[in-house]
Amino acid sequence: RLHLTAHFNNEVNESVTHAATVRSAIVKLDGTAITERDDTPIVHTSNYKEMLTEAYETEKKAVETYRQILPLVEKIGDTELYDSLEVVYFDEQRSVEELRMMLKD
């Protein structure tokens, strides 16, 4: 499954970009960006279907998180911030769809 290597490498790069966007948003709102991992277990596997399923569930959670955040940012009235987070939201939606299609194969 060599195509998975490229997929997950792209996801890593996208995640780093998203983290920088969110960190900037937090700082812009006078917050303090911290790194604290949630308690969701990390699944270690060589089963590609399991990898894709775990990634799919993670991306769905990200989509839901950004879906909840966007209206809050819209209330603030900061269109630049809204636009940057909306791009992340759309990226996450695209990832969900890509993973859904990969799981169908």
Q: Each PLM stretch: what is its role?
A:
Residues 2-36, 98-103:
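Conserved alpha-helical segments that form or flank metal/cofactor-binding pockets of metalloenzymes
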Residues 20, 24-25, 41-95:
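Acidic/histidine-rich alpha-helical segments that form the ligand environment
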